């Protein structure tokens, strides 16, 4: 963040944000976040095998004292709470390592080993968490892993805690909700490259953390930069009420598909009266549609499952913990927390739909909807991650899609072309920029952005407009209560000033590729076909993978790649090889000579184009 565009309007906006927040004198969250602290690492830096730092616990040491002028005071408070790192006792037999990654790792003491809920994002941070637990509580092996849901910050560190050979031998169980593996790999396959680029904005990954950069991610301090892995589940949870005894510990499960993830579940420990609500009730409003991109979630289903959680466990839960943030203690406190959290999602859904049925569009709903004071005053319903504004548009999108029914929007111009025409119609870029400066001086930041954005989209080389727009993004980032809105504003500002940093093509981890079903990989090839390369050509190759007893025919005709399993009729060309060798050639770029008609396969692969990892966002 360069020198912040200062002035009375910014000061008033920040003061207004503080006044609108709940009671800053309410210190209950600080008690909950600090309760049960045991210890943390002596060395704050967690490194990979090559010495690269993948996580730095000292990166948040700046979060002391009052909020500076560059950070919303409410967000500063949330980041201070999330910055508490180390090993914490939750209740007898249950501990958490918090602050070692975006999510928490929960350790339950079994008869012989640890039952770990959610082994973080990276193998390195997961290993550091396990080492800390064993150092402070006594060394034990990991007896079981439990994945609460199918997002990588909850399973990517698996190999840091278990050896896959022990899993294959049956010495370690890996438990997950039904559909976990399918959704864990699918989310990052078809749209993975675009999601990865947008995630850089959401998490502010290219910016240094601090008062002028990312100030947490709203649900954690950030995402570790280590080795992402996947150890496949050995046991699926298929119904609510299913009970297991794992290493002597009774566990009961509630399936919650379609809430924060398409495959998700809560875990209840009846003998400890402890409930894990996964990512269904974090200390913030969550995303119904994540800005990085994903399928829209169902706010109504989310609320309904929290109602079910209250019915199943509300009168027998003394401790509540989640996959992010800090625990809650006391039956009445927990019941009220879950109920008000539920009510926030239900209100979001119902009122967005009511306004939609009154004819309002997504942006109009977002500009009108407000939580009732009884819900909005709770810190845990504030929009540190998801926001009411963004989520209300997601509800509209779920039911109505992108089209608002106005015929003027049936065939819109490209944004750059439309912007160029708007700028010309308004008298040229200098006049439009002057109007933008007037809007900013009047405190109308959003109109200033709308005007300056038109200039930049029309002409990315307009340096004064780029710098002005970057400055307004700095200002909006400083005001944002949402950590990820702040990150997106500040990343946009950086790219307006310095351009897009060259990226490397996103590649799935070896574990992820191994776990991906072959049909999904062939679908990935299909969305990479460039019709300019295949124009007027045709190709067909049979792929035979004896190690998996699979046979597919992949064909390109009419500039479309299609495939079929167990094809009939003779093949035009055939490649027979272990699937791992095919993956290495097709997706990793290895130069291997595959048995069979390798030339035909290479010709077909030549029609494909790798995704662009560094496409522009704030310019065109």
Where are these regions (language model features)?
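Conserved beta-strand hairpin/beta-sheet module of binuclear metal-dependent hydrolase folds
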Residues: 80-140, 264-269, 273-279
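Surface-exposed loop and adjacent secondary-structure segments within mature catalytic domains
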Residues: 163-217, 229, 258
């Amino acid at each position: 963040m360069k020198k912040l565009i200062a002035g009375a309007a910014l000061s008033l906006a920040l003061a207004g944000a503080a006044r609108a927040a709940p009671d800053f004198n309410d210190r209950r969250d600080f008690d909950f976040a600090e309760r049960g602290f045991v210890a943390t690492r002596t060395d704050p830096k967690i490194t990979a095998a090559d010495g690269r730092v993948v996580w730095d616990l000292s990166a948040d040491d700046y979060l002391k004292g009052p909020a500076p002028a560059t950070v919303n005071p409410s967000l500063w408070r949330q980041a201070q709470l999330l910055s508490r790192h180390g090993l914490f006792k939750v209740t007898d037999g249950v501990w958490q390592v918090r602050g070692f990654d975006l999510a928490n790792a929960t350790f339950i003491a079994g008869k012989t080993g640890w039952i770990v809920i959610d082994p973080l994002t990276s193998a390195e941070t997961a290993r550091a968490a396990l080492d800390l637990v064993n150092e402070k509580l006594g060394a034990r092996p990991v007896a079981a892993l439990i994945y609460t849901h199918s997002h990588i910050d909850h399973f990517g560190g698996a190999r840091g805690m278990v050896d896959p050979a022990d899993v294959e031998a049956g010495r370690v169980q890996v438990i997950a909700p039904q559909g976990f593996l399918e959704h864990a790999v699918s989310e990052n396959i078809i749209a993975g490259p675009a999601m990865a680029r947008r995630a850089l904005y959401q998490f502010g990954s290219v910016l240094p953390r601090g008062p002028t950069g990312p100030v947490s991610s709203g649900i954690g301090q950030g995402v570790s930069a280590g080795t992402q892995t996947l150890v496949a589940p050995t046991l699926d949870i298929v119904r609510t009420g299913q009970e297991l005894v794992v290493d002597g510990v009774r566990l009961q499960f509630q399936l919650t598909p379609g809430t924060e993830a398409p495959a998700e579940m809560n875990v209840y420990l009846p003998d400890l009266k402890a409930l894990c609500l996964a990512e269904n009730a974090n200390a913030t409003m969550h995303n119904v549609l994540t800005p990085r991109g994903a399928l829209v979630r169902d706010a109504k289903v989310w609320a309904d499952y929290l109602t079910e959680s209250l019915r199943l466990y509300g009168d027998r839960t003394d401790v509540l913990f989640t996959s992010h943030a800090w625990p809650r203690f006391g039956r009445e406190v927990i019941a009220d927390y879950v109920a008000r959290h539920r009510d926030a999602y239900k209100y979001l859904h119902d009122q967005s739909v009511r306004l939609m049925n009154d004819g309002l569009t997504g942006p109009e709903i977002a500009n009108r909807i407000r939580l009732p004071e009884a819900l909005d005053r709770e810190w845990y319903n504030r929009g540190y991650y998801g926001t009411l504004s963004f989520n209300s548009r997601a509800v509209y999108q779920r039911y109505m899609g992108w089209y608002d029914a106005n015929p003027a929007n049936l065939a819109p111009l490209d944004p750059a072309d439309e912007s160029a025409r708007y700028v010309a119609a308004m008298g040229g870029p200098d006049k439009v920029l002057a109007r933008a400066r007037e809007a900013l001086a009047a405190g109308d930041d959003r109109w200033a952005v709308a005007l300056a954005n038109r200039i930049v989209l029309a002409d990315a080389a307009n340096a004064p407009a780029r710098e002005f727009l970057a400055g307004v993004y700095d200002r909006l980032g400083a005001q944002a209560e949402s950590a990820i809105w702040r990150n997106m504003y500040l990343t946009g500002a950086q790219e307006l000033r310095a351009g897009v940093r060259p990226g490397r093509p996103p590649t799935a981890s070896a574990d992820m590729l191994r776990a991906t079903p072959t049909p999904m990989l062939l679908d990935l090839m299909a969305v990479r076909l460039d019709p300019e390369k295949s124009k007027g050509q045709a190709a067909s190759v049979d792929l035979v993978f004896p190690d998996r007893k699979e046979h597919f025919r992949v064909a390109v005709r009419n500039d479309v790649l299609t495939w079929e399993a167990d094809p009939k009729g003779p093949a035009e060309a055939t490649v027979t090889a272990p699937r791992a060798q095919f993956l290495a050639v097709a997706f990793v770029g290895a130069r291997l000579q595959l048995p069979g008609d390798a030339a035909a396969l290479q010709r077909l692969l030549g029609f494909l184009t790798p995704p662009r990892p560094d496409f522009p966002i704030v310019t065109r």
